[in-house]
């Protein structure tokens, strides 16, 4: 999903600020549905084992459009034999309880909540418009709703971060006890 609440200063992925595209979301999902229809027909005999919804930030879609996206996937693909069905829930400022509920109503087996760091000064510096407390809130909501496989993404080498900042982040993430932890090193490059 090529939309985000805003563009993080370090990001090299192609994404568009959702606020500029809200009037085009129905058109985007209609085009995506045609692509899903074509792909499901072309791969009819292929027993896929994984679905991965990435971005951008899929949860930058509002609840209605997120539900529509997930329902289209259910309609066009056999999800009964999947080994993994992941959605990048993404940035805590785009995750709501209602969106988590929508995800839970589908056979999603893994979500990724991506704080990148647990240091507020760094979050502010890199253009992430959420608070550390938001990370704890959405993680708790996801557990409350019964998500049993939660990944968290971190980035090492963010501007101004010291070894002590990284230790703090790791200590805070360890307290949450995610099922998976993905650690990236910052790599500044041109948009993909």
Regions found by a protein language model. Name each.
Residues 2-15:
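Local cysteine-cluster metal-coordination motifs and their immediate loop/turn environment
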Residues 15-42, 46-192:
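Conserved non-cysteine loop/helix-boundary elements of the Radical SAM core domain that shape
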